[in-house]
Structures are given as structure tokens and as C-alpha cells.
């Protein structure tokens, strides 16, 4: 119900109660959010940060493509920027290139296509990465030797009290699937510094990347992408494979036959089964190769987001 009740009554946010989270994630697993807010814009987000009770846990949701939600849902406030903070604008361009300004709730794939349409190169790697620019910043998303760090000019962030700050890639400490985001801060937008490119050439590069993806990844099934981080000098999928777990299944949660670091939902997987599968893979890999795998994905529990070192 809009702005009329809940922990943060305000006309600048839409506030919904008991919202199913599974449809808002790519894995399609999990229970309800106690509250879900959609701020009307940057001002609405700032007002929400200033007025919402600090004792309620808060989670910023992007495209939910790096996330496993607990079957019992989340007993706090999910902030969703995808409906209102999703503009993609060419801020400047000349013969050498340009600057693309993108709000955090914009889809990563759409961002890549807008850059291409404007003859701006450097975001082709994003064409097959699901989710939003906010999530891509938080995860320093990357593929095919490129990542957000390599193209980010700067990002605008909001702190827990609703004030705006600007940070560049170095200040954000972007590294492999990592960002030094201060606790409670939210990405609002990003500016990407892109070189001039030829739209058809960028399109063909995207096609090539997406073809490789289709060959290697189980895109027909719901998943959250790579479950584990690649340990130094190794690929998590090879370690899981070597431990004999390719295709292993608990209920409807399965280690993909196609890519052993993608765990797929065959239809009605529960978070319980997915977590059992994760722990099985972790233990078997430790026994088989002596490597301790850590999660790339986050697990949203009723109390908040659970992550592992490095993320
Ligand atoms: C089929 C498939 C393929 C994938 N391929 C790749 C790949 O090639 N490379 C890669 O890097 N990843 C890949 N991923 C993983 C995932 O798509 C990326 O990590 C993506 O960038 C996550 O974005 P999201 O918006 O979905 O984030 P979410 O899953 O919604 O959130 C991820 C984290 O970001 C935080 N977050 C989201 N928005 C904000 C914000 N505005 N401010 C602050 N924090 C925020 C969340 O709180 C959470 O901690 C893949 C996933 C799938 C399902």
C-alpha cells in the first residue's frame, strides 16, 4: 500500500508488505520480505534513509542475480531501486568517446546496449550479465577479462543518513567480485568512461560473448551464476568437478551438468536443499583437493545478508 502505513510512512516511497522475493531473483527461491520500499527517486531515497527506523534490517536489492533467499524470507525492509532509479544518459560525447551516466536500478544488459547504440565501446562484457548497475558496482561484475573497475569514472553513493558522496574506482577498492562499500551505503548512480567504437563491431563482440556464455552456462534453468569464488590460481568449477559432483542433486537443487559452479533450480528447489548442496560441495572439495571454497553469492536470511570473506 502506498505511503499509508508501515515503518516509514512517506509519500515519496511506495511501501509494500509481505512481498514474495523469489520472483525478484534469478534463482526463484525464497520467502517473503516483511517490507519492500520503492523510493520515488533520489530525494525519496534520501528521505527514506533519514526517517526509516534504524533497528529494522535493510537490504538493497538489484536484479537478485547473485542471491539465495531463505525459505523463511527476510524480516526487514528490502529497498528496490529498479522501478524508479533506472535512467541511462549519455552525459558527454565527442570523436574520442564519451561518458555514460547510469542510475543504480538500470539493468546491466540494457546499459551495454545503450552504450553500443551510441557508438561507445567498453561495456560489451556486460551484455550477458543479469542484474542492475548497483549490483554490478557492488560485485565489481566482470567477464572475458573486463570488469566494472576498468570502465568506471566514478559512482554516486548515499550514506545511511541520506547524504550523497562521490567515489572513484580506486576509492571504492574494487577488486575481484569485491568492493569496499561502507556499511549501510547505497549506490545511486555511476559514470562510465567509454572509448569511441563502431556500433556493428561492438554488436558482433556481444554476440561472440553471448555465444560463449550459451555454450558454457545452463541458461535455461534458474541460477545465481557462479556460487563460489574462484580461489587463487584455480577455477571453482574444476574443483567441484574433480570432487565428482557434476550433476549431483538434492531435491530440485542441482549442480549443473553443464557448469559445475552453477547450481540450478530444477523447478521447486528450497533454500534448505540449495544450502545442503553448497555445504556438500564445500566439504567434498576440501576433502578432495584441500581447498576451502568461499561463496560468491550472498544468502539473504530473515535477519539479513550473509556473505563470506572476500566478497
Ligand atoms: C546466468 C548468470 C550469469 C552471470 N554471469 C556473471 C558474470 O559473467 N560476471 C559476473 O561478475 N557476475 C555474473 N553473474 C552474477 C550476477 O549477475 C552479478 O553479480 C550481478 O552484478 C549482480 O547484480 P544484481 O543487481 O542482480 O545484484 P543482487 O543480486 O540484487 O545483489 C548483489 C549484491 O549487491 C548489492 N546491491 C545491489 N544493488 C545495490 C545498490 N544500489 N547499492 C548497494 N548495494 C547494492 C546487494 O545488496 C547484494 O549485496 C551471473 C548471474 C547469473 C544468474
From Swiss-Prot:
Cellular component GO terms held in the UniProt record = cytosol
- Cross-referenced Gene3D superfamilies: 3.30.465.10, UDP-N-acetylenolpyruvoylglucosamine reductase, C-terminal domain (3.90.78.10), Uridine Diphospho-n-acetylenolpyruvylglucosamine Reductase, domain 2 (3.30.43.10)
* EC code: 1.3.1.98
Where in or outside the cell is it found? Cytoplasm
Q: Give the EC class as a word.
A: oxidoreductase
Short name of any one Pfam family annotated for the protein? MurB_C
Task: Specify the pathway.
Answer: Cell wall biogenesis; peptidoglycan biosynthesis
Active site location? 177, 226, 296
Q: Which cofactor does it need?
A: FAD
> Taking the first listed entry, what is the main subcellular location of this protein, grouped into a coarse class?
cytoplasm
Keywords from UniProt, A to Z, are: Cell cycle, Cell division, Cell shape, Cell wall biogenesis/degradation, Cytoplasm, FAD, Flavoprotein, NADP, Oxidoreductase, Peptidoglycan synthesis
Asked if Translocase is a keyword of the record, the answer is: no
Q: Which InterPro entries match?
A: FAD-bd_PCMH (IPR016166), FAD-bd_PCMH-like_sf (IPR036318), FAD-bd_PCMH_sub1 (IPR016167), FAD-bd_PCMH_sub2 (IPR016169), MurB (IPR003170), MurB_C (IPR011601), MurB_C_sf (IPR036635), Oxid_FAD_bind_N (IPR006094)
Q: Which GO terms describe its biological process?
A: cell division; cell wall organization; peptidoglycan biosynthetic process; regulation of cell shape
Residue intervals of the FAD-binding PCMH-type domain:
28-197
Query: What GO MF terms are annotated?
Result: FAD binding; UDP-N-acetylmuramate dehydrogenase activity
Can you state which reaction this protein catalyses?
UDP-N-acetyl-alpha-D-muramate + NADP(+) = UDP-N-acetyl-3-O-(1-carboxyvinyl)-alpha-D-glucosamine + NADPH + H(+)
Q: What protein family does this chain belong to?
A: Belongs to the MurB family.
Q: What function does this protein fulfil?
A: Cell wall formation.
Recorded protein name is UDP-N-acetylenolpyruvoylglucosamine reductase
Organism whose genome encodes this protein: Magnetococcus marinus (strain ATCC BAA-1437 / JCM 17883 / MC-1)
| Gene encoding the protein | murB
Amino acid at each position: 500500500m502506498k505511503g499509508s502505513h508501515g515503518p516509514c510512512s512517506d509519500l515519496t516511497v511506495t511501501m509494500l508488505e509481505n512481498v514474495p522475493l523469489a520472483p525478484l531473483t534469478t534463482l526463484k527461491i525464497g520467502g517473503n520480505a516483511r517490507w519492500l520500499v520503492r523510493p520515488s527517486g533520489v530525494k525519496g531515497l534520501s528521505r527514506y534513509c533519514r526517517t526509516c527506523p534504524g533497528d529494522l534490517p535493510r537490504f538493497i536489492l538489484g536484479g537478485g542475480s547473485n542471491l539465495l533467499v531463505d525459505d523463511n524470507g527476510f524480516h526487514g525492509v528490502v529497498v528496490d531501486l529498479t522501478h524508479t532509479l533506472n535512467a541511462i544518459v549519455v552525459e558527454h560525447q565527442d570523436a574520442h568517446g564519451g561518458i555514460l551516466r547510469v542510475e543504480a536500478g538500470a539493468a546491466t544488459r540494457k546499459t551495454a546496449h545503450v552504450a553500443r547504440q551510441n557508438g561507445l565501446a567498453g561495456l560489451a562484457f556486460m551484455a550477458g550479465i543479469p542484474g542492475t548497475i548497483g549490483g554490478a558496482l557492488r560485485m565489481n561484475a566482470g567477464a572475458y577479462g573486463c570488469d566494472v573497475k576498468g570502465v568506471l569514472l566514478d559512482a554516486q553513493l548515499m550514506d545511511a543518513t541520506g547524504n550523497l558522496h562521490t567515489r572513484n574506482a580506486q576509492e571504492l577498492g574494487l577488486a575481484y567480485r569485491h568492493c569496499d562499500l561502507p556499511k549501510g551505503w547505497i549506490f545511486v548512480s555511476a559514470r562510465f568512461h567509454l572509448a569511441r567504437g563502431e556500433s556493428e563491431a561492438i554488436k558482433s563482440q556481444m554476440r561472440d560473448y553471448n555465444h560463449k556464455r550459451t555454450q558454457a552456462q545452463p541458461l535455461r534453468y534458474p541460477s545465481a551464476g557462479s556460487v563460489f569464488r574462484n580461489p587463487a590460481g584455480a577455477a571453482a568449477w574444476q574443483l567441484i568437478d574433480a570432487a565428482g559432483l557434476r550433476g549431483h542433486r538434492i531435491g530440485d537443487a542441482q549442480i549443473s551438468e553443464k557448469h559445475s559452479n552453477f547450481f540450478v533450480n530444477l523447478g521447486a528447489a528450497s533454500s534448505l536443499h540449495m544450502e545442503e548442496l553448497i555445504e556438500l560441495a564445500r566439504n567434498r572439495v576440501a576433502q578432495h583437493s584441500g581447498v576451502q571454497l568461499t561463496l560468491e553469492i550472498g544468502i539473504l536470511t530473515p535477519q539479513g545478508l550473509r556473505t563470506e570473506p572476500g566478497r
